[in-house]
Amino acid sequence: MLKNNKRFLPKLIKYKKYSEKGGYLIPFENVKKRIALGNNCPIKIKRIFFSSAKKNAFRGDHAHKLCSQLLFCVNGSIKIETIFHVNKKKNYYISRNKNYALLLPPLVWSKIYFKSKKSILVVICDYKYDNKKEYINNFDQFINISKKKFI
């Protein structure tokens, strides 16, 4: 059992964004030491996907057993509702205008709301896609697993 292990808490991470000539660049790399130009990705990059939805629609509504994810918004604004350590809840907000990404460790239930008409979410994962073995789609099952791990 783990009690409030910080490794299993969602965390906002500031990243560098470079703007010039009417555009911007956000580099992420897997390196042992932070270099001057890029952002050191806090997880190993195994998979990347993009997601969008209509304004006020949501995606997610699940947790992962093993996968950590780094979520950042490249257009619009996004709200992420999280539940972790059985019953702790916290909302996070990320947007194109703020240079923060959200690190979601395993065993965090998340529901992602697209707050703008053209919001786009980029997700970096440290685990391959495996819906049957890796996803927790049932909230009661998530609570039971969390109780065993954190209480």
What is the predicted role of each segment?
Residues 97-101, 107-114:
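Well-ordered alpha/beta subsegment
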